[in-house]
A protein has these predicted regions:
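Conserved beta-strand positions in repeat-built beta-propeller and related beta-rich domains
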Residues: 52-62, 106-119, 162-166, 202-208, ...
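A short beta-strand micro-motif common to beta-rich folds, especially ectodomain repeats
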Residues: 10, 21-33
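Repeated scaffold domains used in trafficking and secretory/extracellular systems
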Residues: 87-99, 144-155, 187-197, 229-240, ...
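Surface-exposed binding patches on compact interaction domains or structured appendages
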Residues: 1-13
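Short loop/turn segments that connect beta-strands within beta-propeller blades
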Residues: 72-74, 128-132, 173-177, 217-221, ...
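An edge-strand/N-cap motif at the start of beta-rich repeat modules
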Residues: 46-74
């Protein structure tokens, strides 16, 4: 509760309600003149989860990235929804799909595996998650205005920060939906990135030929340091102040802990990882072996460092495999 003398206004602030039920409170205000006001306040319950948007990367060069909608209440999955709702293809190689505020952002890298792009093939597709309709297609370009390939995106303070194969981190203003700053990296072919204590940490994979994590000051958008790692760092997550976890990709799918105060790197045994995400103190990793067509999923507790295999009963959960583009 806050009150500023002379303005006759009392401002109430409440923490977000994460419960599945609404909650009520009674507030009693008494003035210096003895006037009492009683208020009954009810805070709405946590919104019911309707479903999930699922991004299919597609096959590079085939222009067949797509989105599916999984309805939680019915267990039904609706495929190829971007084309159905927008009348156009989503694009070539959908590499990431993230929610921030009231919008959803799809990172469309473009065809082939080279580090350069062509006009109108690499962009950020901004989507209304309530309707699946496109809000804006933002053509992705370097600081010099040349078409470039975006790879991943993270958000902080109303801005999106996008890694690029042009060896940059590009800043997106989420209000104006315009690219407004570029940070030049000393590494090559940037992939995953995360934010920790006012710094952006960016994996430079070089498609297997680089071994650096760039440190970018989020205010000045300049590279302020470089951390040497194992070869081919690709994914990275923040797990609290001063602690990051990153993984390397082909040929070694390994998880590492990076302690920032001394830049110590520690290998985490027993986890095979190609993709990962962090949630509530746990890192969830996945790896698919294209030789055996077998997948592996692990949960790694960052506090206890316990590794637990996760076995998904896809049939029991009612979630079919999304392999059709």
């Amino acid at each position: 509760v806050s009150y500023e003398s002379g303005k006759k206004e009392v401002v109430f602030s409440a923490k977000e309600n994460d419960d599945n039920e609404s909650r009520k409170a009674q507030v009693v205000l008494t003035s210096v003149k003895g006037i009492t006001i009683e208020l009954q306040i009810e805070q709405a319950k946590k919104p019911k989860l309707a479903g999930y948007w699922i991004l299919s990367e597609g096959y590079a060069g085939s222009n067949n990235a797509e989105m599916a909608w999984f309805d939680v209440s019915t267990g039904e999955i609706l495929k190829k929804q971007f084309k159905a709702l927008n009348g156009t293809e989503l694009g070539d190689t959908g590499n990431a799909l993230k929610m921030y505020g009231s919008k959803m952002y799809a990172v469309i890298t473009g065809p082939n595996w080279s580090d350069d792009s062509e006009d109108n093939l690499s962009y950020i597709e901004v989507i209304d998650p309530k309707t699946g309709k496109s809000i804006k297609r933002i053509q992705f370009k370097t600081a010099d205005g040349v078409a470039a390939k975006p790879r991943n995106i993270v958000f902080d303070g109303g801005k999106g920060y996008i890694s690029s194969y042009s060896n940059e981190v590009v800043r997106l203003d989420t209000a104006s939906l315009e690219l407004d700053a570029h940070a030049i990296l000393s590494g090559t072919l940037a992939e995953g990135l995360t934010i920790n204590d006012g710094k952006i940490y960016v994996c430079n994979s070089g498609q297997g030929q680089d071994n650096k994590i760039s440190v970018v000051d989020i205010q000045s958008m300049t590279e302020t340091g470089v951390i040497t790692t194992a070869m081919n760092p690709t994914g990275i997550v923040s797990a609290g102040s001063g602690v990051l976890y990153f993984n390397t990709n082909y040929p070694d799918y390994v998880l590492y802990k990076l302690t920032l105060d001394n830049e110590e790197i520690t290998e985490i045994p027993g986890v095979n990882v190609a993709e990962m995400t962090y949630l509530n103190g746990n890192i969830y990793t996945s790896l698919f072996d294209w030789n055996t067509y077998m997948g592996e999923i692990y949960k790694f507790n960052t506090a206890t460092e316990e590794v637990t295999p996760v076995n998904l009963d896809l049939k029991g959960a009612g979630i079919p495999m999304l392999m059709e583009y």
